[in-house]
Amino acid sequence: MQEHLIVSLDGKDYLVEPGTNLLQFIKSQDTFVPSICYNESLGPIQTCDTCTVEIDGKMERACSTTIDRPMIVNTQNDKVQASQKEALDRILEKHMLYCTVCDYNNGDCEIHNTMDQWGLEHQTYEYKEKPYEKDYGPFYRYDPNQCILCGRCVEVCQDVQVNETLTIDWERQQPRVIWDNDTSINDSSCVGCGQCATVCPCNAMLEVNMEGNAGYMTDLEPGSLAAMIDLTKKAEPGYGPLFAVSDSEAAMREERIEKTKTVCTYCGVGCSFDVWTKNREVLKVQPQHESPANKISSCVKGKFGWDYVDSDERLTKPLVRKNGQFEEVEWEEALSVVAENFNKVKGTHGSDGLAFISSSKATNEESYLMQKLARQVIGTNNVDNCSRYCQAPATKGLFRTVGHGGDSGSIEDLEIADMVVLIGTNTAEAHPVIASRIKRGHKLYNNTLNVFDIRKHEMAERADNFYQPKPGTDLVWLSAVTKYIIDEDLHDKAFINEWVNHFDEYYKSLAPYTMEFAEETTGISKDALIDFAHQVADAKSVSIAWAMGVTQQDIGSDTSTAISNLLLATGNYRKPGSGAYPLRGHNNVQGCSDMGSMPDQFPGYQKVTDDEIRAKFEREYGETLPKQVGKDNHQMMEGIHNGEIDSLYLYGEDTGIVDSNINFVQAALEKVGFLVVQDEFFTFTATYADVVLPASPSLEKTGTFTNTERRIQRLFQALEPKGDSKPDWQIIQAVAKAMGYDWNYTHPSQIMDEIARLTPLYSGVNYDRLEGYNSLQWPVAEDGTDEPILYLEGFNFEDKKANFYPLTFDNFFKVNEEYDLHVNNGRLLEHFHEGNMTYKVPGLEYKVPNAFVEVSPELAEDRGIHEGAEIKLISETGEVELVAHVTDRVKGKEIYIPLNNNAMAHGDHGAINLLTNSDVDKDTDTPSYKRTSCRMEVKTRRGKSPLNPTNFRVNKQRQPQYSVRVQDKWKREDYTFPGSQVDR
C-alpha cells in the first residue's frame, strides 16, 4: 500500500496519506471551502452542496471524497465559485438572515460565518417562508422557517445518539424535520439529549433557555422582532454591512456570556462541555468534539439538568440546631460548634467514636481532604463513600484477578468491540452516552450485543440475544460458560500460559458448573448458553460491562470475579475492544475511592495495614496514623446503634434515603450524638443534623473528577458560590483549622500536587497537564504518560500475571409464600438517584413527576389491577405506597421501582429503601438492594398513569434509519446538483 499520494491543491503539490478526507485535508491547509452541513463529529452528510470543488476536472463534493489516488483539486476557479454561490443561495432561500436580533448570533452560526467569509453580498433567491409553526419541547425548540435541511440533527439522532427519533420528510412539497411518525417534539420518543441543538449550524434547533435570552435585542415580542428584522434588512444595502453590525453585537454578547469548561456532575461517564452562563442562569451546555469521554454527546441531565444550581432551595447559610430548631449562623460559630463537639466525642469515645462519609459527587481534591481530616486530624480510619453501595464488589473482583479496580479500557473500546455483553445494567438510562456508543457500534458496525438482565429495558430490546436469568444467578451461567469453553478446548491457551496463574486449580473448581446445573439454576436454556459460549470464543474482542444488577447482590464480588475469569479464559484483556467495564454510577465514585475515602485504604488503594505505606503518609501528615481497618458505611450504622460511634460527618450524600433498610439507618441518625451534614440542599438526612453546612455544586468550584474509564478531567469554576455557601474543599479545610490543623491550601491544584506525591496511580497528574479538554487515564507516570488500555505491560501483580479465582455458589434466592414478589430497582434516565438535584429542574420533573412501580401484564391481571392502580408494597422491613405502571419491561412476579423518590421529606411514602433489608455482599458489605421481596396490597384498581403521557416510554414509535437519506433529496424533481448546473 502506498504511504502517500500526491494531491495538487490550487496549484501546489502535497503528500497526503491515503484514506484522508478531502475536505479535512483542504481545511488543514488553511484553504477556505464552505461546508455548512459538515461536522467533524458526524462526517459527510452531503445535503448542502456548499463544499463542491473541482477534482480532476469534475465537480464533486469535498466532504464525501476520500483521497484514494493522486488528485488535482481546484477550490478557486470560476466554476467552483459559481457552484458554491448557487448552493449558498439555496440555503438563504430557506433561512432568513437577521443576525443582529437572532438568539444564535454568538459567533458560532455557521450560516452567518460562511456567508461572511465567502463574501456573499446579495442572495439570488428570495427567502420563502414555510407553512409550519415553531415546535417547542421542554428543553429545546425547532423553527422550520429557519431550518436549511442540512440533516445534522437527523444524523446525530440516528447514528450518534441512536435514539432514532428524527428524520427528514423529503416527500413533502416543502420538506422538514419530523419527530417519529410526524408528531410534536413533546409527544415523541425524544429523550431530550439535546444533541440536535448541539450540532445545528444555526438557530433552527435551539435550547429554550437561549431563546430571548442571549442577545441585547432578542427578548422583543414577536411582532416587534419581525419589524426590527424588516427594518434591519431594508437599511442595509448588502450583507457585508449587516454582518459588521451583527458581529459587533455578537462581541458585546461575549462580554456578558461566560463560557466555561466543566465536567458533568451526574453519572460516571464523565461528559465534559462548555457551559454558557449569563449572571447566574445557565443558557446552554455545548459539548465539544475534543471532549474526551463524550465528544459531542450528552444526555438530558447533562445538557439540560442544571436549574438546581440556582434553585431557591439552595442552602446559603450554615444552620445550627438550637433548642430543637435550626437557626442560621455565621461560619465562625458553625465551625466552632463542629470542632467543640468533635473534640468532645473524641475525648469520651476515642478517635474511633467519630465516622466520616465522603461524597462521590465531590471532587478528587475534596475526597482526599475528607480522608485526611479523618486520619490526620481525628486519628481514625472510619471513612467511606458511596462506592460501598454499588461499586465495591466490582472493584473487589478486579483486584482479585487483574490487580486494578477500574475499567480495563476506554469508552471507545465499547464501541469498537466485536462483542459487547451487558450484565445487570440498564445502560441506556443509567449511562446514556456509553449506551449510545454501544448502540452505534451495534447499528453501524454490526457488532454483536448480548444482554443478560431480569428486566427488558431498551438495550435488551436492541440486543441480538436477550437472556433473562433468575435473580442473583449470574455467577452460575458465567462459570458454566467458562467451563464449557475450556471443556471444548475453545479457551485462549497461549494467553493463559503467558499471562494467567492458577489455571489448574481454577478449572477443577468449575466442576459443579455444568450446563445442566446452569439451566436449572438460572432458567436460561442449555442450548442458549452453549450458543453464547461459542459466540464469546469466536469473537475477535469481547467487552463485558456490568453495574448494580450484579454488584448489589449477596455475591456481588464473586459474580464480578466470575466476569473477569471468563475474560481471562478467552484472552480478552490487553487489547482494544476487550476487557472489563464496571460502569461507575456517580460522576466521581471512581475518584472518591481512588482518593482513599475508604476504611482500609489510603489514596491509590494503598493499604492502611502496610507499615511502609503508613509511614509515608505519617511523614507527610506529621501524625501517627491508625493501622487498624476502620468501619465502612454499613458498619458505621451498626456502630451507632451499639454505642461505638457517637459522631458522624457526611457530605454530598442523602444517607437517610439511599442506604438500605432506611428504617434502621434513620434510627441511627436519630440516635447519633452529633451529626454534621454538608450539602447543597436541606436533604432528608439534614433533618436529623445538629449542624448543616452549605456547600457549592460543581459549577461553583474548581477541581477534578475521575470517570468510569479512569479518566481524570478538570472542571473550572463557572459561577460564584451562592450566598455564603462554599466549595467542599474550603469547608473541610476550615473544619481542620478549627481543630488546630492549618493546611494552608489556597487552590485545589495544591491539593492535587500533594495527592501526586503520595499516590503512584496519580504521580504524573497536575493541573497544567489537565488544562482545557486535556485528560489523563490512570495510572499516570511521573512524566505524564497514561494508560488508556490497562495491562499492556502486564497485570498489576508482582509477577505481572493475572490470577484465576475459584468460586463457589450456594446462594439461591427464592421468594416465599408471604413475600411473593421480587423487587428490582434502579435509575431512570430523567432523574439521578433520589432526585435532590433533578426534581429542581422543571423539564425533568414534568416528564417524570414521581416514582412509580412497574408491574407486568400477567401480574396485573392476576391481581386485578390496571394502569394507575394505587398499591401498597410490604416487605419484612417496611412498606411503600406507589402507583402502578403496567408494562412488559418486567415479567411475572418481578416488579421494578425507580430510585427517583426523595419525597419522604415531604410526607410521601415511595422510597425504595423502606423495603430493602440489611443483607450485604459477604466480601464488601455492599447492601443487597436487588435481593428484596415483598407482598402487594391493592388500594385502588385503576387510576391516572404515573407517567406523563408525553414520556418517551408511553407508546412512542421510533423511526430507525441510516443517516439522513440524502439520496431521497437528490431524487426530487426540484433538485439539481449545483456542480452539474455550472458544468452545462
Curated annotation (Swiss-Prot):
PROSITE patterns: 2FE2S_FER_2 (PS51085), 4FE4S_FER_1 (PS00198), 4FE4S_FER_2 (PS51379), 4FE4S_HC3 (PS51839), 4FE4S_MOW_BIS_MGD (PS51669), MOLYBDOPTERIN_PROK_1 (PS00551), MOLYBDOPTERIN_PROK_3 (PS00932). [4Fe-4S] cluster 3 binds at residues 157, 190, 193, 196. [2Fe-2S] cluster binds at residues 37, 48, 51, 63. [4Fe-4S] cluster 1 binds at residues 95, 99, 102, 109. InterPro entries: 2Fe-2S_ferredoxin-like_sf (IPR036010), 2Fe-2S_ferredoxin-type (IPR001041), 4Fe4S_Fe-S-bd (IPR017896), 4Fe4S_Fe_S_CS (IPR017900), Asp_de-COase-like_dom_sf (IPR009010), Formate_Dh-H_N (IPR041924), Formate_DH_asu (IPR006478), MoPterin_dinucl-bd_dom (IPR006657). Residues 257-313 form the 4Fe-4S Mo/W bis-MGD-type domain. [4Fe-4S] cluster 2 binds at residues 147, 150, 153, 200. [4Fe-4S] cluster 4 binds at residues 264, 267, 271, 299. The keyword Nucleotide-binding does not apply. Residues 79-119 form the 4Fe-4S His(Cys)3-ligated-type domain. Residues 138-167, 181-211 form the 4Fe-4S ferredoxin-type domain. It comes from the Bacteria. Residues 252-984 are annotated as: Formate dehydrogenase. Residues 947-964 have a biased composition (Polar residues). Residues 3-79 form the 2Fe-2S ferredoxin-type domain. It catalyses: formate + NAD(+) = CO2 + NADH. Its cofactor is [2Fe-2S] cluster; [4Fe-4S] cluster; Mo-bis(molybdopterin guanine dinucleotide). Binds 1 [2Fe-2S] cluster. Binds 4 [4Fe-4S] clusters. One of its GO terms (cellular component) is membrane. Residues 940-964 are annotated as: Disordered. One of its GO terms (biological process) is formate metabolic process. Gene3D superfamilies: 2.40.40.20, 3.10.20.740, 3.30.70.20, 3.40.50.740, ADC-like domains (2.20.25.90), Dimethylsulfoxide Reductase, domain 2 (3.40.228.10). Keywords: 2Fe-2S, 4Fe-4S, Iron, Iron-sulfur, Metal-binding, Molybdenum, NAD, Oxidoreductase, Repeat. One of its GO terms (molecular function) is 4 iron, 4 sulfur cluster binding. In the C-terminal section; belongs to the prokaryotic molybdopterin-containing oxidoreductase family. This is Putative formate dehydrogenase SSP0601. It comes from Staphylococcus saprophyticus subsp. saprophyticus (strain ATCC 15305 / DSM 20229 / NCIMB 8711 / NCTC 7292 / S-41).
